[in-house]
């Protein structure tokens, strides 16, 4: 979900590149860079952090030239810093590359290229591409790119500069979007239309593995065999805001539609598709550790907590490991029982959730093995976990309500369960391989679920005036109901609650009256009859019932449903990955029908603010802070934070040491 721009024309490239990158900021990023070529010399400028940092560097050290490429990076390999920022070059600086996507075999290629004498300066998979192109280069960059494609496994959108072709820009794509903008005397490239729309509304869409060769006079497109094809330009009528949303009305809807791609990326990053096995090192726990574990404690907030509840079900089932799931804001205050031999897993989309971060440090203090699952490389939680961090590959989420981050977190819970199940001897490799094979089909099945959208929209328009909505389910469906209910109340402001279906008779059924809307999640075949009996209980009291079920349960569910949404069949442990999609769409369309601000619900923000027990992000005034730092450093205290003190003790922090810097340094 990084941003790519490219330009060749008569104007100074740096200004157009920076403008294009600014129009892709909504995608999220942690660093940015540009490369401009002039007279066969490629010059780079890169900066960590906001685009303004890069713009300031370019302003003080301009990059002259009328051809260039640019990139905003969302880290997937290597932490966010200037070195890992794109563009990347070969050793001689003759080839520059920007890249979106994930090269799955980059470690293998990196080893091969090192053996040939290539020297790497970054931790990224992208630098591998630059060295590979240099190694393969035979004087014809088009044929070089085509040969490189046969060696690259994974997804990529590439823009390439070649010092030996100073008036040509090359780009190609596979499983990652890339758009070419056409105009007289100038051509443009963007990973998304907003980067181009100020300059041209005529675009050429590249198919898989096609290569576009851009010159000032025009664009030529070749298939992966090297055959040129005729251009098929289209005209774009979107306004800029609509372009940022990819033509969708809201980011939330766009991100729901991005879920199949996010599922595919996360799966590919952790599973060897040829062997259909978890990649070695994908999960930071050895077989010896897995077999010695007593318990696993999962701690998270909000949507991530609900992913953890799914994790409890699948890990206990497949790995036979006791799992406790706790709300991060409560964890520290219940005097948790953890020690060596226990494992702690923190889940956070942003990697900055303060309560979750504080819980991690408490678990670390108690001696547990601490792991983390996050979507953001280099985040506070990722840094705290160190080598024990796992990543989802959902890409940035702009909408406040999490959708694709949740679905990839659930996917990771299933993958972790399989990995632990094999290592603990409760799953044979053949059974695990078959389950992974079925998981590989989930992105395609998720695309099929999107066909329910018109039915969801119609139903929402009829029921958007409801004041209360209840979700029920059993087992995994109960965990799913919790997230479905949160999503609805979060964006539509409808009072919604989720209940284990068997608990209705213990009080909740008193709230059911004529016209009450009840959504029953019915994916677990072995529990279907019991859940349907609860459905009949609420129907007999006047409820309107919506049922979400797989094809295999269609006939049984249809008898009791006022509305039925049917998803494709899959293994029972994988069905939550499909069933969540229609209820996310339901929350979205209910909110739209009620006129709510879908992307920015009232009173909510994307990442949680710091817990009150944590220190301020900012130190005192610079002069006072510097003076205080010198005194405190001499005294052996933290030079930037109020350590020691009652606030820190209450937060459960430990004193820093030379081998262990201040745990709280990220807040200063």
Question: Positions of the model-derived regions?
Answer:
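Short, membrane-interfacial amphipathic segments enriched in basic
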Residues: 630-643
């Amino acid at each position: 979900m990084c941003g790519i721009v490219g330009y060749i024309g008569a104007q100074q490239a740096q200004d157009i590149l920076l403008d294009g990158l600014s129009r892709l900021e909504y995608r999220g990023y942690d660093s940015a860079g540009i490369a401009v070529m002039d007279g066969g010399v490629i010059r780079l400028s890169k900066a960590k952090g906001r685009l303004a940092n890069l713009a300031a560097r370019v302003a003080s050290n301009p990059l002259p030239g009328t051809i260039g490429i640019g990139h905003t990076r969302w880290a997937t390999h290597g932490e966010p810093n200037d070195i890992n920022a794109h563009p990347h070059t070969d050793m001689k600086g003759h080839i520059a590359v920007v890249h979106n996507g994930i090269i799955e075999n980059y470690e293998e290629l990196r080893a091969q290229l090192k053996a040939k004498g290539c020297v790497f300066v970054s931790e990224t998979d992208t630098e591998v591409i630059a060295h590979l192109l240099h190694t393969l280069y035979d004087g014809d960059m088009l044929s070089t790119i085509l040969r490189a494609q046969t060696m690259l496994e994974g997804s990529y959108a590439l823009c390439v500069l070649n010092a030996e072709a100073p008036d040509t820009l090359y780009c190609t794509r596979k499983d990652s979007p890339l758009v070419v903008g056409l105009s007289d005397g100038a051509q443009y490239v963007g990973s998304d239309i907003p980067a181009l729309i100020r300059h041209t509304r005529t675009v050429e869409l590249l198919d898989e593995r096609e290569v576009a060769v851009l010159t000032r006079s025009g664009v030529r497109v070749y298939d992966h065999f090297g055959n040129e094809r005729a251009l098929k330009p289209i005209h774009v009528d979107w306004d800029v805001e609509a372009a940022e949303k990819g033509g969708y009305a809201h980011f939330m809807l766009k991100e729901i539609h991005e879920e199949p791609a996010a599922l595919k990326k996360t799966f590919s990053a952790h599973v060897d598709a040829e062997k259909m096995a978890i990649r070695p090192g994908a999960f930071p726990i050895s077989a010896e550790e897995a077999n010695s574990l007593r318990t696993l404690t999962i701690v998270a907030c909000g949507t991530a907590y609900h992913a953890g509840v799914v994790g409890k079900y699948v890990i206990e089932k497949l790995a036979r490991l006791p799992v406790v799931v706790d709300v991060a804001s409560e964890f520290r205050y219940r005097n948790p029982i953890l020690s060596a031999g226990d494992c702690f897993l923190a889940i956070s989309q942003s990697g900055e959730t303060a309560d979750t971060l504080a819980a991690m440090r408490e678990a670390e203090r108690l001696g547990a093995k601490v792991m983390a699952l996050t979507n953001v490389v280099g985040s506070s939680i990722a840094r705290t976990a160190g080598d024990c961090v796992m990543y989802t590959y959902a890409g940035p989420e702009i909408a406040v309500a999490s959708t694709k981050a949740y679905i990839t977190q659930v996917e990771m819970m299933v993958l972790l369960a399989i990995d632990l199940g094999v290592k603990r001897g409760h799953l044979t490799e053949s059974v695990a391989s078959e389950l992974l094979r079925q998981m590989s089909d989930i992105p395609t099945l998720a695309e099929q679920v999107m066909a329910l959208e018109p039915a969801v929209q119609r139903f929402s328009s009829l029921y958007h005036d409801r004041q209360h909505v209840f979700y029920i389910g059993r087992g995994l469906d109960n965990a799913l109901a919790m997230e479905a209910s949160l999503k609805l109340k979060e964006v539509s402001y409808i009072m919604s609650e989720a209940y284990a279906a068997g608990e209705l008779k213990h009080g909740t059924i008193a709230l059911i009256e004529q016209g009450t809307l009840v959504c029953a999640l019915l994916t677990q075949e072995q529990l279907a009859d019991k859940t349907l009996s609860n459905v009949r209980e609420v129907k007999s009291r006047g409820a309107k019932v919506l049922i979400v079920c797989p094809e295999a349960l269609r006939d049984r569910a249809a008898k009791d449903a006022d509305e039925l949404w049917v998803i494709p069949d899959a293994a029972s442990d994988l069905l939550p990955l499909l069933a969540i999609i229609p209820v996310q769409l339901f929350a979205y369309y209910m909110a739209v029908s009620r006129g709510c601000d879908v992307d920015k619900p009232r009173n909510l923000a994307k990442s949680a603010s710091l817990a009150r027990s944590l220190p301020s992000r900012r130190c005192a005034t610079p002069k006072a802070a510097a003076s205080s730092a010198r005194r405190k450093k001499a005294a052996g205290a933290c030079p930037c934070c109020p350590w020691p003190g009652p606030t820190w003790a209450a937060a459960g922090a430990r004193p820093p040491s030379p081998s262990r810097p201040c745990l709280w340094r990220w807040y200063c």
